[in-house]
């Protein structure tokens, strides 16, 4: 089990997102991997799309993924809680990390499609759905 780096939910596998923490840039010039659950990945990618579409202004803060003190955007998370069900919480993420989350989201969805496509070939033929 591993924990999501944004919401802390414990899950068997996380989706890797490369980040570039400013304090570690000399030790890790290629970046550091953070792990997100699918819900947090979806929320952060949704925020990225909204920022690009609406040109949302940022505010100064500390990014929850890379730790840089820069302009950040609010990402709404849905954190599971045994007593309250789902708790909504906002975390701050910088534009650079949002862009990296978007790349990870695209890569993750592409892998899911390829996996589904491969499962369709289990019996040696593709399942064709008429449209």
Curated annotation (Swiss-Prot):
Optimum pH is 8.5. Keywords: 2Fe-2S, Electron transport, Iron, Iron-sulfur, Metal-binding, Methanogenesis, Methanol utilization, Oxidoreductase, Transport. The keyword Acetylation does not apply. InterPro entries: F420H2-DH_FpoO. GO terms for molecular function: 2 iron, 2 sulfur cluster binding; metal ion binding; Methanosarcina-phenazine hydrogenase activity; reduced coenzyme F420 dehydrogenase activity. Its cofactor is [2Fe-2S] cluster. Binds 1 [2Fe-2S] cluster. The keyword rRNA-binding does not apply. The FPO complex is composed of at least 13 different subunits. Component of the F(420)H(2) dehydrogenase (FPO complex) which is part of the energy-conserving F(420)H(2):heterodisulfide oxidoreductase system. The membrane-bound electron transfer system of the complex plays an important role in the metabolism of methylotrophic methanogens when the organisms grow on methanol or methylamines. Catalyzes the oxidation of methanophenazine to dihydromethanophenazine. It shuttles electrons from F(420)H(2), via FAD and iron-sulfur (Fe-S) centers, to methanophenazine (an electron carrier in the membrane). Belongs to the FpoO family. This is F(420)H(2) dehydrogenase subunit O. It comes from Methanosarcina mazei (strain ATCC BAA-159 / DSM 3647 / Goe1 / Go1 / JCM 11833 / OCM 88). The lineage of its organism: Archaea, Methanobacteriati, Methanobacteriota, Stenosarchaea group, Methanomicrobia.
């Amino acid at each position: 089990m591993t924990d999501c780096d944004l919401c802390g939910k414990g899950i068997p596998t996380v989706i890797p997102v490369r980040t570039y923490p400013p304090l570690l840039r000399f030790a890790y010039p290629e970046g550091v991997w953070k792990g997100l659950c699918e819900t947090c990945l979806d929320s952060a990618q949704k925020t990225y799309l909204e920022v690009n579409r609406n040109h949302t202004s940022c505010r100064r803060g500390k990014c929850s993924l890379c730790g840089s003190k820069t302009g950040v955007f609010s990402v709404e998370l849905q954190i599971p809680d045994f007593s309250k069900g789902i708790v909504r919480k906002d975390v701050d993420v910088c534009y650079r990390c949002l862009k990296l989350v978007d790349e990870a989201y695209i890569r993750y969805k592409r892998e899911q499609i390829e996996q589904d496509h491969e499962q369709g070939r289990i019996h040696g033929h593709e399942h064709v759905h008429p449209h």
